[in-house]
Curated annotation (Swiss-Prot):
Binding of GTP, residues: 14-21, 91-95, 146-149
GO terms of molecular function: GTP binding; GTPase activity; translation elongation factor activity
Ranges where the tr-type G domain occurs: 5-221
Protein's UniProt name: Elongation factor 1-alpha
Compartments where found: Cytoplasm
Region feature (G5): 185-187
Source organism of this protein record: Methanoculleus marisnigri (strain ATCC 35101 / DSM 1498 / JR1)
Function: GTP hydrolase that promotes the GTP-dependent binding of aminoacyl-tRNA to the A-site of ribosomes during protein biosynthesis.
Lineage: Archaea, Methanobacteriati, Methanobacteriota, Stenosarchaea group, Methanomicrobia
Keywords, sorted A to Z: Cytoplasm, Elongation factor, GTP-binding, Hydrolase, Magnesium, Metal-binding, Nucleotide-binding, Protein biosynthesis
Pfam families: GTP-eEF1A_C (PF22594), GTP_EFTU (PF00009), GTP_EFTU_D2 (PF03144)
EC number, as in UniProt: 3.6.5.3
Gene: tuf
Top class in the EC scheme: hydrolase
Amino acid sequence: MAAEKPHMNLAVIGHIDHGKSTTVGRLLFETGTVPPHIIESFRKEAESKGKGSFEFAWVMDSLKEERERGITIDIAHKRFDTDKYYFTVVDCPGHRDFVKNMITGASQADAALLVVAAPDGVMEQTKEHVFLSRTLGINQLIIGINKMDAAKYDEKRYNEVKEQLSQLLKMVGYKPDDISFIPMSAFVGDNIAKKSENTPWYKGPTVLDALNALSEPEKPTNLPMRLPIQDVYSISGIGTVPVGRVETGIMKKGMKVSFMPANKEGEIKSIEMHHEEIPQALPGDNVGFNVRGIGKGDIRRGDVCGPSDVPPTVAEEFIAQVVVLHHPSALTVGYTPVFHCHTAQIACSFVELMKKLDPRTGQVKEENPTFLKTGDAAIVKIRPTQPMVIEKVKEIPQLGRFAVRDMGSTIAAGVCMDITPKQMR
């Protein structure tokens, strides 16, 4: 078995009906990910219906039918390989939990492919998704200007849309010069896997080339070690075994650690991954570890493990930048929904609405607004109702994002800008 290629999480973003699903379908199709037996069954069906020419469209329609019948395409379909990487397509926006997943790290994207339909250009969700990507720290972006077939492969139209997008990207803080813009048609297949003869004026990479050219995500090993606890087991003959994923830094055997906000200390006796003992664990590793000096009742899910000399930060209150994604009426001071941050779920109160921002530029629109509604971006002050670990997004981004949930849906998403720490010792 060859060594596993490096893995990348790819978010496919863009306005509704601009061709996100078709683009994903085309990438799966072109990389040989749609299983041959599925293609074969469509080919037969196409022939039986007298449609001799088997087209990619059939694959897409069938995937769409599966969705409509309520069968979600399992995740195996959503993985594809390029020469350099293997990609997982993380939930696309439109899924209710997309933002929650993106923020709480269930599927932190390493890069995003923004799909913009050439006939329409920049639309409302295009702006929203670009702003969100920036807020969430997605630094690598590829832009597919899609449906070029519908725009008659017109170079002038492509340049107009590219210019609109460049303005938008600059506004939120991306550098358009570092980004690939690709004229494409996911439906026809132009410039996805191979250069299209329909765009002789375009000299740049195909979408697959651009995906291959992304830089490998760096493991945040230089940051202080942080491991949010998912579960705690008590194993006879061994003792207390917390389980979780290392988010940052390196966990080593013999390390003195603190669990916050439990405020308990211990020493790591052993670390296990996939039932094998390992001397150290790196970011992304899911591990169980045994700690000397900690009882099962001392710590729980939502606590965070870190080195005793740089323990996880417990917030008395914190200042956050939030985007209100879906609130039935208006959000005011005193509102206390549940914040999902790493593995913790804690009710937190909005104690001050400091500034309302323009969600497309991040510029201040209004000081001390009286309320926030769906679509607003703002700087707010938050006070957790119980002790909670959160870090500044600039310092430890993996623990600086959160989603706000209430009544079964994601109300808002945000990042932590500043913290008033709670004195724990």
